[in-house]
Structure formats: structure tokens, C-alpha cells
Amino acid sequence: MCEVMPTINEGDRLGPPHGADADANFEQLMVNMLDEREKLLESLRESQETLAATQSRLQDAIHERDQLQRHLNSALPQEFATLTRELSMCREQLLEREEEISELKAERNNTRLLLEHLECLVSRHERSLRMTVVKRQAQSPSGVSSEVEVLKALKSLFEHHKALDEKVRERLRAALERVTTLEEQLAGAHQQVSALQQGAGVRDGAAEEEGTVELGPKRLWKEDTGRVEELQELLEKQNFELSQARERLVTLTTTVTELEEDLGTARRDLIKSEELSSKHQRDLREALAQKEDMEERITTLEKRYLAAQREATSIHDLNDKLENELANKESLHRQCEEKARHLQELLEVAEQKLQQTMRKAETLPEVEAELAQRIAALTKAEERHGNIEEHLRQLEGQLEEKNQELARTAVQVRQREKMNEDHNKRLSDTVDRLLSESNERLQLHLKERMAALEEKNTLIQELESSQRQIEEQHHHKGRLSEEIEKLRQEVDQLKGRGGPFVDGVHSRSHMGSAADVRFSLGTTTHAPPGVHRRYSALREESAKLALPLTVTLRSPTWMRMSQGVCCNLEYHSSGTLCGSSGPLPVPEMIQEEKESTELRAEEIETRVTSGSMEALNLKQLRKRGSIPTSLTALSLASASPPLSGRSTPKLTSRSAAQDLDRMGVMTLPSDLRKHRRKLLSPVSREENREDKATIKCETSPPSSPRTLRLEKLGHPALSQEEGKSALEDQGSNPSSSNSSQDSLHKGAKRKGIKSSIGRLFGKKEKGRLIQLSRDGATGHVLLTDSEFSMQEPMVPAKLGTQAEKDRRLKKKHQLLEDARRKGMPFAQWDGPTVVSWLELWVGMPAWYVAACRANVKSGAIMSALSDTEIQREIGISNALHRLKLRLAIQEMVSLTSPSAPPTSRTSSGNVWVTHEEMETLETSTKTDSEEGSWAQTLAYGDMNHEWIGNEWLPSLGLPQYRSYFMECLVDARMLDHLTKKDLRVHLKMVDSFHRTSLQYGIMCLKRLNYDRKELEKRREESQHEIKDVLVWTNDQVVHWVQSIGLRDYAGNLHESGVHGALLALDENFDHNTLALILQIPTQNTQARQVMEREFNNLLALGTDRKLDDGDDKVFRRAPSWRKRFRPREHHGRGGMLSASAETLPAGFRVSTLGTLQPPPAPPKKIMPEAHSHYLYGHMLSAFRD
């Protein structure tokens, strides 16, 4: 701003006339200056006001800038370096994902091309392949090739990939649509950002325009102008900084948008990857659903097969019930026959009395005619009984034919079930077709079974009709008994009228004293010769019947009746009896005779009614589990369990009706065979060693005439005194017979004991059998109804068939003995020898033996069979049964190898010797029989599956697995080859502690070299004292827990798997584990302290585990006593074992330790334990699946 000074006008050169004008001009100048100053002051005031406004606006702009800065700082992250690093990482991941996507697309294109090519090929060659498959199936219907599976799998693969392609296309289309929508949204967002930026530029221009200050053309003071200039510079700086901040804000917003775009792409990639993972998961779920569907189909098919099998078993049970009912009908018929015979005898007695009275009083021809009519009626009744008996035999024949047809259908069902199982394993994709075929077959079988059931119903109706006929016979016999009563009354009347003819009759002895009865023939000379002969024949017949009646009819009422009959015969046959009582008066004699006749009539009536009621109510008695009084006659025919108690199955408690009504089959155990070999003759011993022969075991009916005939056949020379002694023995020991009967009924639920009395009665040593029947300790033998029915009409034919069986069994043993003596390798054995070996040594079931007999012709074929061939040809579907057969084959191949000397095992079970040494042993110590065969020299011959199931498993405390072990026929030979899968799947041993317990039990057997006698001996020695805990059973551990004062907790050890070998060998088993098993509470510190103290004492006294010196007090295994000794020199036997070990297979281990001696000094060289090597410890990995 510049100051404008007023212009000074130069005056006139004239001077004075112009002075007044100059003063006026100065005043005017001063007025103008004052006006100008006022204007300047007003302009200054306005400028100051504008400056204040601009300053206020500047403050507002600064405040707005600060707000924007704070907003920017809050919106943007603090660390730009980490943000950029994460951005670079996201970009790298994005590139990797893009590369993976490109690779997957390439692979997908390649697979699409390959699938299209395969589809073209399959569609081109499908018809020819189907024709070849059809031809191949027509040629070999048993096996089906896998081309059908390949075709169906390829078709399913094509369809699956087409479905996947369609899904991928749909997802790609949806992703593209989403990308277009997102791009449109992004374009809209960009437009909004540009519009906002333009709006910000307009606001900046307005601010800049408003910030300029126009200065008037007036001059200002220097201070004011300087301040204004400084304010303008400051405003320019602030505007510049504001523009810079806005530029930075724009750059930051661009970076933020870029980052948001990168984040969106990363999110899209993540979504795509999640979609891929979800797609894979859905595919996996679909595959699992398909798998579950297939498993459900397989389970439904198995359920249908099981239902068919249950139907077959129900039909078998129905068949057994029908047979049982038929046996009951036979027993009822026999009782009827017996009672008819007794009635006939009583009638003959009455006829004898009548003849005597006729001799004394010849004036009674009418009575004789009436008696003749009664005799004719009785003969007609006997003829009717004969017709009924023939009808029953015909019904029995028809029932046996139906049983054979049922057996054949059962065999067909088993074969078809096995075929179905094979097809299920091979063709899992064709289950529907197999299901329809199996349904058709099952419907056919159902129709056949329904027809068989209808036939059986007709048989039942016929049996019911025969039962009605028998009841009619009973009524007829009742009428006959009433007629006999009438006859007796008439006889009494005749006696009353014929008093003078009975003067010579003396008083008779008491009715029950049969020992004082004597026969006097003094008065028989007066009778006619025919009458005398008839009387003598009748007396001989009654004398013959007296003994069997005494032996068979055990009840006191039958005894009294038989004695009464004998006394009555004596009384009426003789005119005088031994006695000195003198003649009685005639009325008293007549009264006494009348009373005795009435008593005998009452006894006959009670016998008839009680016999019929017992026969009719036999089923009810059996359902109640009670044994009628007439069943006491079963003492000779009852079967107690064997002395060892190992063959009787241990069953849970069931109802008496189930124990009596259910019947099954059971194989003869080796202990029972040994017991019979000791007791019976050599011929019967050879016969009783027949292995796995099964027979239906039924409850024996009451004694019948067949029993009488068998007893006559068994001991014809038995005197009356011996019969009385047998009767006294039976009466004195009823508890033993009842207990044996009860044990028989309990054991007969599933398995029956093979009856052999039919064979025993046909042998020469009958006196020995009679001794057996008397001796209660040796047990009794059960007579089945089938053998009764076979022995009664055709005893010679039965003996002939039994001799044939004996001859066949002896021939089988002879074949095995010849093969052993000749030292023939197993590959050179012929078919009969192999079948005999399977039947007598291995103990395979009869079904497998029959299949081997049909398919295996030599030992070479048997040893060359693979696992699949064993399953397919022989039909052994159980894997453990196949393992049993493979181990037996491997054992025989090794033992009969031509390079090694043939070996056998002595009765001790520990030493393997050659045949020459065995013969020397046999010559030095003769056995009780000439059985040099393999029955007693077998490896593990005394540790068969019955010993494992009945003795060994309960001794380990694992009796709950007995049925599974028995079903899989697990013997000691198989124990070391059981895998975890076998234990879990086949033997249902899921508990790991139970498997551990079983493993330590097997280790105990290894340490004893699988010697059963040694095991039993050591258990017996350690039964009453704390030593040799290794062989303790579960019961001994329970007894020990009870003895230390923990009786309340001892019951928890049952079925727990705790035994001595587990305590002695398991390092991890301590007192805390035992307390946990005993379920001793942790609060009961006293009981736990007692357990700890006694457990440590038990380990110190009875095991090799010792306590460490440390604080933890953990028991450790001390070196075994076997490690402390050197093996002694084996001389010849050690050389033999080493030579035989060279010829055995690679996996076959031989124990080279013989009997060990204690060393002279402790510091000896430590040798390995003997239990790590034993003869049958080899693993047959080649045979395993």
C-alpha cells in the first residue's frame, strides 16, 4: 500500500492577492485528509473483520483436517509393512491356487478323455464280452468270472463321472454369474468413489477462492500490511498441507480398495476351496452310504440264511419230539403188554385154582365152560395187541424214512448255504440277483418242509388214533379185571360149598415171606397127568419170571405182588406146607383165603390204574422234572457222567422241562474212551474208540419186557440170590442212582452220551458187564428206546451189525498202525488211511470226514490242498477248523518225513523217541492193552478241544468263552497260532485283559511242554500250600483270597481271567490291579494294606518275581531256574533230536533241552529258557489268510 500525498499547487508569482486562497486550500486539504483517514480506518476495520473470519475459517479447516487425519488413522492399519507382507503372501497363495486349478483342469480334461475312450471301448465290446461270460458260466456253473464285475464297475464309474461333470458345470455357471454381479457392484463402487473425489475438488476450489483477500487500492499502514501478508502466507501453507493430506488420503483410499479387491479374490478362492472340500466330503458320504447300503443288504441276506437255518433246526427239534413221543408210545405199549401178561398169569393162577377145586368137586362143569370163554376172550385181546404192535412198527418205519428225507434236505441246505457264502464273498455287487435265487430256493425248501410237516401231522394223527386204541385196550383190560374179580368171588363161593375137599390144607406162612416158600409135590400125584404137566410148566415159567421181575420192578408193591403170586402158587399146588401149627378150621381157612384174594385183586387194580396213569402222564411228569417210582428201575440203564467229569458240558441253570425235553448230540471224549478201554474187553474197547459218532440221547422209559429179555440175555445163569443182592444194592444206594440220573438229565440238553449197551450185551465178557452194572462207582450205561426197539425183535441181527462195526473200526486202527510201523510218509498214505487218521486222530466232525472221503484219495492230495481248496472241496467254512486241519497235516508231514526217524510220544508227554525205543519201552513195561497205535502217543492227544473247553478255560477263569472254543474245535495244537483277529472275531474275546490272561495261560503250558499230567501233578502238590503259583487255577486264587480275610470280595474273581500264571509271569500285574479286579474300595485302606502285604508274600514264596531295592517296590522277574543250569549231555537222544530238527520245516522249532540236572556250583553259564522251544511252536504263515 502506498501513501498519496495531496498535491501542492504552486502559487502565483504575484503573491499577496493569492494568500486567502492558499489558506482555504489547506483547510480543504486537511478536511480531505481527515475524510481519507476515516475511510482508511473503515477499510482497516473491514480487513480486520475479514481476517478474523478467515482465521476462524482456517481454524475450522485445521479442525476438519485433524478430524480427517484421525479418521484416516483409525480406518487404516498402523503397520503398513505387515499389511504389504500379508498382501504379497495372499498374492503368492493366489498364484499357487491358480496353478493348482490349472493342473486340476488339465487332469480333469485328461480323465474325461480317458473315460470317453473307455466308454467307447466298452460300448463297442460289451456284447462280445457278455457272450463270452455266458459261455463260460454255461461251461463251469460253479465259478463266475470277473468280467461282469469289470463291466459293471466301468459303467458305474462312467455314470459317476458324468454326474460329477454335471455338478462341476452347474457350480461353474453359478460362479460365473456371481462374478458378473460382483463386477457390476465394483463398477458402481468406482463411480461412487469418482463422484466423491470430484465433490472434494469442488470444495477445495471454493475454499481457495474464499481464502483470497482483495485489498483496496488504499494505502495501509506498514504493520497492518505486514500482518496481512503473514496471514496470507500462513493460509497458503495450510491450503498446501490440506491438498497434500487430501492427495495422501486419495492414495490411501486407492490402496485400501486394492487391498479389499485382493481380499475379495482371496475370499473367493477360499470359498472355491471350501466348495471343493465340501464336494469331496459329499462324495465320501455318498461312498459311505453306498457301502452301508451294501452292508445292510449283506446283513439282510445273512439274516434270511440264519432264518432258514433256524427253520431247519426247528424241524429237527420237531423230529426229535416226534421220535420222543413215539418212544413214549412204545413204552406205553410195552407197559400194556406187561400188564396183560400179568393179568394172563393171574388168570392162569385162577384157572389152576379152579382146576384144583374141580378135582375136589367134580360137579362144576358150568364154571369150566365160563372159564374157557374168558380164556378165549383173553386170547382175542392178545391178538389185538399183536396187531397194534405191528401197526406201531409200520409207523416207526415210516418215521425213519421221513427222518432220512429230513437229513437229506438238511445236507442240501448246508451245501447251498456254503455256496451262498462263497458267492457273497466273491460277488458283492450281485447280491440282489443271489438274493432272489436264494429266496426261490428257500421257498422251495419251505414247500418241501411244509409237505414234510403235513406228513408228520398225519403220522401224529395216526399215533393219536393208536393211542386211542391203546386206551380202549386199557378199558377192555379194566373190564377183564372186573370179570376176574367176579371169577374170584365165584371161586370163593365154590370154596365155601366145597369145604370137605380142603380138610388137608394147613395154615400157610405170611404173605411177604418169600424166603420160607417151599414147593411140595406130595399131593400132585392125585391130579391128572395133563393137569400136572401144565402146572409144572406154569411153575417153571413163574420161576423164570421171578428173577427179572425182582430185578426190574424195583418198587415194593411189585415185590409184594410177585411174592404173593409165588405164595399163591405154592398154596394151591401143594396139599400140605411145612409147619407145625396144625389144621385150621374150614370157615377160618375160607375167610382167610377170601381176604387174601381181595387183597390181590386190589393190588392188581392199583397196578393197572397206576401203570396207565404213569404211561399217560409221562409228559407231565417230565415237564415237572420229577421221576416216577417206576423209573427207579433205570439204575442198570442210567448213565452217570464219566469219572473225569470232562465230557459233560457245563451248562447254565435252566428249567427242568428244558433239561428233560431238549435233546442233542455230543461227541465221545477221549477220557470216556480211555475209561471204557480200561473197563471193557478188547473187542468192545476197539469198538468204543470210534470217534465223533453221534446218537440221540433220550430219557429212558420205565422198565419193560425188553429190559427183562436183555437181562436174560446178559446173564442167563444169574441165580435168585444174586437177583436179591442186586435188588438190595439198588435199594441201599438210591442216592447214587438218582444223582447219576439227574446229572444225565442236566447234560442231555444239547449233547447226549453215546449208548453202547447194545454192543456190550453181545460180547463174551458178560460177567464183567454185570459187575459193572452192580458197581455204582464205575457209572451206569443208558439204554435208549431206539436200541430197545432194535434189540427186542432182532437180537441176532443187531449182534451181526455190531460185529461189522467192530470189524470196520479195527480195520481203521490196523491201517493207521500199519502206516506207523512201515514209516510211510504222509504223501504215500492212501485214501482210507487218511480218512481213518482224520476220524480217529484229528477228531474232525463227521461231515468233514465224509467230504474228505469223497474228495481226498491220498495223503499227497491232502497235503497239497490250499486254504481255498480246503474250503471249497471239503466244505470247511470255519477258518479255525481249517487251521486245525492244516496244523494236523503239517504235523504229520513233519513227523513222517523220510529223512527224519518216525517219532512218537510216550505216556509222559515230554520225551519224543523213535519207534525202536518205543518198542523197547513197550517190551519192558507192558500196558493194559495192546494199543500201540497213535491213540496214546499222539501229540496233544490228551489236550483235545473238550479238555480245553471243559477244564483249561475254567481253570484260567474264562469259562464264558467255552462254547466258542468248543464250536471252533480249539485244541492245544492251535493255541500258539491264534491271532488277535481269531480271538476277537471267531472266539468273541473282545476284552484285552482276557486275551492277556489267555496268553499267559499258553505261556504256562509252554513252560510245562504241554504236559497235562505234569500240570495236574503240580496243581495237586500246590493245592494246600503257597508254592508253585505258576500252575494255580482261578479257584485256587479265589481260595487264597478267601484265606487272607477278603472273603467278601473273592466272588468278583469268577470269570475274571485271574490265575496263577498271570500272577507269576505278568510284570505289570501288581496288588493295585488285583484290588481293582476285586473291587475293593479305595477308602478301605485296611483291606488294601492286607492285600498288598499278602500279595507280596505270595510273590516271594510262590513265584520267581522278586522285589527291587528301590523305593517303588516293583516286582521283577528273576532269572528262571532253567537259565541257571547247563544242559546235560544228550547222548543218543540229543543226536536224534538234532537230526530230526534238520528235516523239519523252516518255521518248525524243536526243543533241544532234555531233563535238566542241578549244577554242582551256582556260577554256571546261563542258557536260554526251555519253554522258548517246543515241538509244535511253529507258525504256518503260508496257510494263514
From Swiss-Prot:
GO terms for biological process: synapse organization. The N-terminal coiled coil regions mediate homodimerization preferentially and heterodimerization type alpha/alpha. The C-terminal, non-coiled coil regions mediate heterodimerization type alpha/beta and interaction with PTPRD, PTPRF and PTPRS. Residues 729-742 have a biased composition (Low complexity). Residues 829-895, 944-1008, 1032-1101 form the SAM domain. Residues 645-656 have a biased composition (Polar residues). PROSITE patterns: SAM_DOMAIN (PS50105). The modification Phosphoserine is found at residues 640, 681. Expressed only in the heart, brain, and skeletal muscle. InterPro entries: Liprin, Liprin-alpha_SAM_rpt_1, Liprin-alpha_SAM_rpt_2, Liprin-alpha_SAM_rpt_3, SAM, SAM/pointed_sf. May regulate the disassembly of focal adhesions. May localize receptor-like tyrosine phosphatases type 2A at specific sites on the plasma membrane, possibly regulating their interaction with the extracellular environment and their association with substrates. This is Liprin-alpha-4. PANTHER family: LAR INTERACTING PROTEIN LIP -RELATED PROTEIN, LIPRIN-ALPHA-4. Forms homodimers and heterodimers with liprins-alpha and liprins-beta. Interacts with the second PTPase domain of PTPRD, PTPRF and PTPRS. Interacts with RIMS1 and RIMS2. Interacts with GIT1 and GIT2. Interacts with GRIP1. Interacts with KIF1A. The keyword Phosphoprotein applies. It comes from Homo sapiens (Human). Its main location: cytoplasm. Keywords: Coiled coil, Cytoplasm, Phosphoprotein, Repeat. Residues 638-709, 721-757 are annotated as: Disordered. It is found in: Cytoplasm; Cell surface. GO terms for cellular component: cell surface; cytosol; presynaptic active zone; synapse. Residues 24-123, 165-499 form a coiled coil. Gene3D superfamilies: Transcription Factor, Ets-1. Residues 684-695 have a biased composition (Basic and acidic residues). SUPFAM superfamilies: SAM/Pointed domain. Signal peptide: none annotated. Belongs to the liprin family. Liprin-alpha subfamily.
